Structures are given as C-alpha cells and as structure tokens.
C-alpha cells in the first residue's frame, strides 16, 4: 500500500513530500524553503528567518475573517537515526515511508513523524478551501530536537494570536492543555 492512499490523503501526501526532503536537526534549510514555496504557490504571505523558522499567514475563511487569529505550531527538524547496516545518508537522501494501511514506518531509518506529521497537517489546513477557520499564523520552527533553537530565535513581532495549538506530543491519544498569561 502506498502512503498516499492513507486518510486524510491531503495530510499524507504532504507528509510523503516532507519525507523526500532531508530535514534533520541543523539541516532545515531545504524544508524551510519547501514551506516558503508552498506559501507562494497558495498565495499566502510568509517569511523565513536566518534560523530557518518559517511563518505563514492565512486570512480567516468567510464568516471568520474578524475572529481572533490562532497559531498552529510545529517544528521542521527530525532526529536522524538509522539501523546498523543502513547506508542512507540522511543529510542528503530521502526517507522511504512505508505502510501496511495501519502503521507507517521508515525503511531503515527514523521516520520523522515527530514533527513532520504536524507540518503536514498544518500545510493541509493552509491549502484547504473547505475548512472553516479564523486567521491562521502557522509557525514552523527549526532545531527543536537539539534545544528549541529556532523557537528561541523566533521573531514574534508580527504574531498577534493569543492562542497557540502546538502539534507535538510524546503520547498518542493524549491532549495537553496549558495556559500562559501574557500581558
């Protein structure tokens, strides 16, 4: 079975594209450029900084234009590990995502679902013309796996959202909710 046959197909299509781009920690330039190209293709305002953080802005859908914006956040980098004997150079070669329809895994390497699947979900939401949503500020940070370096360098001067949905978790089926009061 091909990964593009999984549902939601838009998400897994983006995830397969992400797997084709080397994006280990410290090597996020190509995935950041991919996200910028995505924004341009969809007519969305976007920016990339010197740390390879990418921010993409999408106006609210019809009826939601004046709602408070929300940040959708994920990180662009992945932990690059491989099985003994695997000759893939993860700094320049693609990850081969495999599926049996129930599980997704990589052939000989880590998959990069942390946090590539979050980036794929965010891109699918940004690309959709059918999902009702408030204004979205998509924040895609770099080098989370090696100390949240991108988040530390993120320019937040044009981010106006008071709510953030971080799509990254250690446990399947667990939702974490937290609140930080900013004055």
Q: What do these predicted regions represent?
A:
Residues 2-102:
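Acidic/His- and Gly-rich active-site-bordering loop/insert found
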Residues 29, 148, 165:
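Metal-dependent catalytic neighborhoods of phosphoester/phosphodiester hydrolases
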Residues 155-176:
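A glycine-rich helix N-cap at a beta->alpha junction
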Residues 51-55, 145-147, 172:
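Short acidic loop-to-helix transition motifs that present clustered carboxylates
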Residues 64-135, 140, 145-146, 151-162:
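Active-site metal-coordination/substrate-binding segment of hydrolases
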Residues 180:
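Glycine-rich active-site loop/lid that clamps phosphate-bearing ligands
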Residues 183:
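Conserved small/polar residues in nucleotide/adenosyl-binding loops
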């Amino acid at each position: 079975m091909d990964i593009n046959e999984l549902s939601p197909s838009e998400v897994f299509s983006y995830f397969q594209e992400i797997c084709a781009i080397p994006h280990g920690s410290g090597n996020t330039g190509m995935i950041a450029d991919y996200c910028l190209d995505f924004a341009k293709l969809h007519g969305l305002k976007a920016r990339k900084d010197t740390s390879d953080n990418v921010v993409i802005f999408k106006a609210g859908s019809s009826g939601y234009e004046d709602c408070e914006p929300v940040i959708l956040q994920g990180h662009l980098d992945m932990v690059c590990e491989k099985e003994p004997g695997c000759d893939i150079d993860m700094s320049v070669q693609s990850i081969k995502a495999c599926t049996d329809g129930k599980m997704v895994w990589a052939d000989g390497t880590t998959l990069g679902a942390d946090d590539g699947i979050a980036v794929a979900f965010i891109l699918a939401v940004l690309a959709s013309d059918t999902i009702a949503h408030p204004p979205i500020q998509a924040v895609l940070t770099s080098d989370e796996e090696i100390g949240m370096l991108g988040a530390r360098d993120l320019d937040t001067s044009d981010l106006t959202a008071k709510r953030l949905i971080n799509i990254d978790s250690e446990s399947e089926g667990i939702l974490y909710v937290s609140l930080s009061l900013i004055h």
